[in-house]
Amino acid sequence: MFELDHLFVWVSPGGPEADHLVAAGLAEGEPNIHPGQGTACRRFFFRNAFLELVWVRDPAEAQGEPTRPTGLWPRFAGRATGASPFGLALRPSHPGNGPAPFPGWEYRPAYLPAPLAIHVATGVPASEPWWFYLGFGRRPDDPGWPRPQSTDHPLGVQEITRVRLAGPGLGQPSAAARAVAAAWQVELVEASGHAAEVTFDGGRQGRAADLRPVLPLILHC
């Protein structure tokens, strides 16, 4: 069994777009950098998962080894010309290095202690999200999380319960995309442009916030 670990969105350097999530009623968590990968992020934590706004802070690192095979740099650089601005990570429902739900390879960035690795899906076009699996992943409200983060938000949301991803080619998705959709509450929809609809708590408040065009996100709570 699998769960959503987090959804990321490529944004401008410094992540000023995160301010729009704050204005929508989300409380920002601790930011992070990824040494050796050339990226940094601003994050928003919920009980079961988190949203991450990521940018490239060091193009040389992002294009060097061992990051180059991930394709992260061309995705960041091409986000305005057709590449998907999203990445989506799954994790096992219970902590532990269980098998991934899709074929892939083990990416071992410098910021992860051995033997931890990120399982990156193969056979995925740049028009689809960057699918990956964290066998070591945990819920943000798990006592074993490395650095505890607040999951309280003025908007009153608690958990991400569904993600709907729209984009070119998602009507005929890759094998990895189909595996992700089968593993958790991820819906894939064909569309001319990229967007993600994130539903919190089953949408019980009956409210929505469309953050486009600043962010390709629609929040339902």
Where are these regions (language model features)?
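Amphipathic alpha-helical "stalk" segments
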Residues: 1-221
